[in-house]
Regions:
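Active-site loop/oxyanion-hole signature of alpha/beta-hydrolase fold enzymes
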Residues: 26, 53, 66-108, 266
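N-terminal cap/lid segment of alpha/beta-hydrolase-fold proteins
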Residues: 3-23
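Conserved loop-alpha-helix segment in the C-terminal half of the alpha/beta-hydrolase fold
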Residues: 219-252
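Flexible "cap/lid" loop of the alpha/beta hydrolase fold
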Residues: 118-122, 128-159
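Conserved alpha/beta-hydrolase catalytic His-Asp/Glu region
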Residues: 144, 158-216
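Catalytic histidine-centered segment of alpha/beta-hydrolase-like enzymes
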Residues: 252-261, 265
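Gly/Ala-rich beta-loop-alpha elbow adjacent to hydrolase catalytic centers
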Residues: 109, 113, 117
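Conserved HGGG/HGGXW glycine-rich cap/lid loop of the alpha/beta-hydrolase fold
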Residues: 24-75
Length: 274
């Protein structure tokens, strides 16, 4: 996949070991490590670091960027008895504490990754110097289930690819052109490695009750055409009152940083400068 190969040119793959298994980081921009706060990227559900494939090379111009495969996703092992964000969060905390010791990090958390960070920040607020939440769930604003399709054993390869395309368009993208053959390949690769099968927490409003425990600045970025918030996007800053800023990227779907990377970078750059 050319997009992935291009992003990996200057990356270092780091394997971090724990008693319960290994996690994998991809790290860029280590020349900035001594002079800047580490920037940690947490991907969305059924994903990997590749959710940030269109962003890492830009972000690494000024930061040391650490993109994690969350435990149970991508190349990282699944800890015991973990199936959703609530049981995952303590293990992510352990990963961050081992990687950065007592140093607080800046966080970019997309969707499920942002939810996990929000749960973690309520218990360990000093882990984060700043959190930038991107299209996060668990705000109690989902109105209905998306029209996602499942696979059957009778489907051939082209039928399976059609299901992946449909699901990407139902949840992740606003534009048909975004669901290219390369991105369908990427989706297939990521979904096949997802061992976190529950999304119960995402449909609750758990973050609303925890947000007052967050002690760092918190910012929100959403795509204007996020399928999860079609009728409720304007309510996000109303219910998530801890946000220091709320920005909407025009003409972008849920996977906003992939679909409109330039507009996304303009917003993130300003936040990271501060």
């Amino acid at each position: 996949m050319p997009l992935i190969a291009d992003a990996l040119q200057h990356a270092q793959r780091k394997v971090q070991s724990h008693a319960w298994g290994d996690v994998v980081w991809h790290v860029w921009g280590q020349e900035h490590a001594a002079s800047t706060t580490p920037l940690v990227l947490l991907h969305g559900g059924s994903g990997s670091w590749t959710h940030w494939v269109r962003n890492v090379q830009h972000l690494t111009q000024t930061r040391c960027v650490w993109a994690l495969d969350l435990p149970g996703c991508g190349d990282s092992d699944l800890p015991p008895l973990v199936s959703d964000a609530d049981s995952l969060a303590p293990f992510v905390g352990e990963v961050l504490q081992q990687a950065f010791e007592k140093q607080s990090v800046d966080l970019l958390g997309f969707s499920f990754g942002g939810l996990t960070a929000g749960l973690l920040a309520a218990e360990h607020p000093t882990l984060f110097k700043q959190m930038i939440m991107v299209g996060i769930p668990a705000l109690g604003l989902f109105e209905k289930t998306l029209p996602m399709r499942g696979m059957t054993t009778s489907m051939d390869e082209q039928q399976q690819r059609a299901v992946h395309r449909h699901n990407l368009m139902s949840m992740m993208f606003a534009h048909e052109s975004s669901a290219s053959e390369e991105i369908i390949d990427l989706q297939i690769h990521n979904v096949s490695r997802d061992r976190l099968r529950k999304r119960r927490i995402a449909r609750t409003d758990v973050l609303l009750g925890l947000q007052d425990k967050w002690t760092c600045p918190v910012h929100g970025i959403w795509g204007a055409k996020d399928a999860l918030y079609k009728a409720t996007l304007q309510r996000v800053p109303e219910v998530l009152h801890r946000l220091d800023s709320f920005q909407v990227v025009p003409d972008a779907g849920h996977w906003v940083m992939f679909e409109k990377p330039e507009a996304f970078h303009q917003l993130v750059d300003k936040l990271l400068e501060n």
